[in-house]
């Protein structure tokens, strides 16, 4: 993850509900290819936490 992505995932982990926090944990553990796949499946969460 790059610095901007880390900030967004950190926001998910800190401010999210149980599902967003679980997504954040997944993002922390994924390699680049799987990170892109998961991000594509849940774009609404990515958008929400990128705007906070």
Label for each model-derived stretch:
Residues 20-51:
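Short, charge-rich amphipathic interface segments used for partner binding and complex assembly
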Residues 1-25:
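N-terminal acidic leader/helix
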């Amino acid at each position: 993850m790059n610095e901007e992505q880390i900030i967004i995932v950190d926001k998910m982990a800190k401010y999210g509900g149980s599902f967003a926090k679980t997504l954040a944990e997944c993002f922390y553990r994924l390699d680049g290819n799987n990170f892109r796949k998961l991000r594509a499946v849940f774009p609404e969460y990515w958008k929400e936490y990128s705007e906070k």
